Amino acid sequence: MSANSSRVGQLLLQGSACIRWKQDVEGAVYHLANCLLLLGFMGGSGVYGCFYLFGFLSAGYLCCVLWGWFSACGLDIVLWSFLLAVVCLLQLAHLVYRLREDTLPEEFDLLYKTLCLPLQVPLQTYKEIVHCCEEQVLTLATEQTYAVEGETPINRLSLLLSGRVRVSQDGQFLHYIFPYQFMDSPEWESLQPSEEGVFQVTLTAETSCSYISWPRKSLHLLLTKERYISCLFSALLGYDISEKLYTLNDKLFAKFGLRFDIRLPSLYHVLGPTAADAGPESEKGDEEVCEPAVSPPQATPTSLQQTPPCSTPPATTNFPAPPTRARLSRPDSGILASRIPLQSYSQVISRGQAPLAPTHTPEL
């Protein structure tokens, strides 16, 4: 060991081993190769940084091959440069393959950026969800029905990608479904995995629509196996159902001029055609609800008394116009639950139809 170290020291002290230095510089290919290698080693991290790195290194080593073949005339220079260039090209090919493997169709990529990326869902987890629906995008033509009440079985869960879907029951409009909303989330949550049922509403496409659909059994298996995906779907479905409930609540406000509690049972019977079919009976019930809120008139002399505004009109063909009344205070939720839904419930039973939800529920 000491002999080798002393020999290296002698070589360093003696100076360069080159007998004669070349007077002319190397050709342009040699300098180009070194410039490309310098740029390549300045590459950053990440996928695009790797593309930058291996791209410049491949070009630099190929220039070294040309320089070793035409100028240096060294077989070892050619072989080593060629080997390094091949390794860099293989790395580039591997990166391209990985990118193509991770690429999703346009619809699913937009769905990921809109729905899952804000929740920081990993891309690999999203791919498992997409694989469950077989990466198929289904379509609906205008006025084509997705489900018919009382006929279509509940055997899938669908998410609308584009278009608009109308939800109705007995021909009465309930609400719309817009892109990136579930089309049948209430039906999905209403059944256990071992139960079967049919739709209680009709879903009709108002425009050309596209959607994705998960088979019920396949999705249940995925949710059972992956707890993270199960929690994700639970959050998405809960938010979707709450949005539909608030939509119905807003429609009630627009129709009756007061806001209903969304926890009231059988909101459909207030929205549905049964409330309109009640006619005078429903108006009479409304008056009965509102009358207790009006303060009784004060006692006045007989000569100064006027005809009360709510007196019974005479039985003539020309009915007087109803008197205008000030907007009353909002009635209690128990009164609303006992008046309007019960009238609709009796009419639905007389028609032989089952209500959407039980109308007799304990007071909260």
Curated annotation (Swiss-Prot):
Tell me which positions the record assigns to the signal sequence. Answer: none
Q: Which domain of life is it from?
A: Eukaryota
Write down which residues bear the modification named Phosphothreonine.
361
Matching entries from InterPro entries are given as: cNMP-bd_dom_sf (IPR018490), POPDC1-3 (IPR006916), POPDC1-3_dom (IPR055272)
Tissue specificity as recorded in UniProt: Expressed predominantly in the heart and in the skeletal muscle.
Q: Which residues are glycosylated?
A: 4
- Name the SUPFAM superfamilies on file: cAMP-binding domain-like
Which UniProt keywords are listed?
A: Cell membrane, Glycoprotein, Membrane, Phosphoprotein, Transmembrane, Transmembrane helix
Q: Name one Pfam family in it.
A: POPDC1-3
Bilayer topology annotation: Multi-pass membrane protein
Q: Name one GO molecular function term.
A: cAMP binding
Transmembrane domains' residue ranges: 37-57, 77-97
Region Disordered, as annotated, extends over 276-333
GO CC terms, sorted = membrane; sarcolemma
Q: Where is the composition biased (Polar residues)?
A: 300-309
Q: Where in the cell is it found?
A: Membrane; Cell membrane, Sarcolemma
One BP annotation, GO: striated muscle cell differentiation
Annotated family: Belongs to the popeye family.
Which PANTHER family does this one have? Answer: POPEYE DOMAIN CONTAINING PROTEIN (PTHR12101), POPEYE DOMAIN-CONTAINING PROTEIN 2 (PTHR12101:SF15)
Function text: Important for the maintenance of cardiac function. Plays a regulatory function in heart rate dynamics mediated, at least in part, through cAMP-binding and, probably, by increasing cell surface expression of the potassium channel KCNK2 and enhancing current density.
| Name of this chain's protein | Popeye domain-containing protein 2
Native organism = Homo sapiens
Name the gene for this chain: POPDC2
